[in-house]
UniProtKB/Swiss-Prot annotation:
MF term (GO), any: pyridoxal phosphate binding
Catalytic reactions of this protein: (6R)-5,10-methylene-5,6,7,8-tetrahydrofolate + glycine + H2O = (6S)-5,6,7,8-tetrahydrofolate + L-serine
Residues annotated as binding (6S)-5,6,7,8-tetrahydrofolate: L121, G125, H126, L127, S354, P355, F356
Protein function: Catalyzes the reversible interconversion of serine and glycine with tetrahydrofolate (THF) serving as the one-carbon carrier. This reaction serves as the major source of one-carbon groups required for the biosynthesis of purines, thymidylate, methionine, and other important biomolecules. Also exhibits THF-independent aldolase activity toward beta-hydroxyamino acids, producing glycine and aldehydes, via a retro-aldol mechanism.
Gene: glyA
Xref: Pfam families: SHMT
Modified residues (N6-(pyridoxal phosphate)lysine): K229
Membrane spanning stretches: none
Protein name (database record): Serine hydroxymethyltransferase
Pathway terms, separated by semicolons: One-carbon metabolism; tetrahydrofolate interconversion; Amino-acid biosynthesis; glycine biosynthesis; glycine from L-serine: step 1/1
Species whose genome carries this gene: Coxiella burnetii (strain CbuK_Q154)
Amino acid sequence: MYEPTLTVESFDSELAGAIRDERRRQEHHVELIASENYVSPRVLELQGSVLTNKYAEGYPGRRYYGGCEFVDIAEQLAIDRAKELFGADYANVQPHSGSQANAEAYMALMNPGDTLLAMDLSHGGHLTHGSPVSFSGKFYKAVHYGLNAHGDIDYEQAAQLAQEHKPKVILAGFSAFSGIVDWQRFREIADSVNAYFMTDIAHVAGLVAAGVYPSPVQIADVTTTTTHKTLRGPRAGLILAKANPELEKRLNSAVFPGSQGGPLMHIIAAKAVAFKEAMQPEFKTYAQQILKNAKAMAEVMKERGYTIVSGGTQNHLFLVSLLDKNISGKEAEAALGRANITVNKNTVPGETRSPFVTSGLRIGTPAITTRGFKEKEASQLAHWVCDILDDIHNEKVIADVKQKADELCGKFPVYQELD
């Protein structure tokens, strides 16, 4: 029996201290990592709910354990809301992460050794899109397309590689591309070689749900996503598809029992409430502001002489290439971090440094938009980033920006209602 009155603070002060410090960091640091966001108190509450106690292998109405009548309600709500939100005919809400959702979709669509055509990691793809260090590059033969000289996806290269390699799956999706993907063009390329067309919208799912970024859900055979990032839900995954009963069976089997056991019911409940939040009119306003803030920041950095990959942004993120500066992405990330501005180093097209050093920065606006930043604050922030990058070893500049960033964060608290 455990002592129910002991708090984490009184029982485990070391862990409580780390959480307290992380809470403080989130309040006092400007978050510009494109894949991060701040969930609502409702999502936080459900992730700590009693649903974490329930084992529920299987699917609603078809469980291997008894006592699932109430978690069935939670999961069915999540399924129905996901389908409605994204205009999908099928949804599986059990994947534990976006990477796992991709692995499960691959399992349903390919056999080991089959060919996958996807975007190159250094041009904006993702580790799970066939990188040799990932399961996706170890279990499948990966071929990669990239960006053209204009910074757009090279569809002609993708079509040529499709004809040459006859992939089983053609994947469109990205982790660091600031443009709009022509989903229909990829559909046509896939059809030309009788391949499955799969999309990974992990980064833009919230924008797609809000209708401010084109949806691939009824164009692709299968769509995967995370449920955090722009969607602002718990850290987890989701698989969507248009109507195809045979494929739906294979997807369900790939998730359970193919690669997962018991689903995380507390996380699935948090997904359900996040999907409901994304259906509200204010979520579209939020998504529109994400785009405005990203464009404002990218424009300032261009004016200040920094190279924006693809020339600008049409979504929530943009890549800053530092190839023409005497700065590495690692140095830039560290200097900005000392000013309480959190970004991540990122590889860029034409990369000359290792993935642990890089020649670029990825900047995203979902989290600052959740705080309430608008174009004015986003533009100020971009100037501060440039001030540091212009004189990266000047600790006085860094200290001045840190003070201004802290003052700005104080005006836009993240979790004031939890204090």
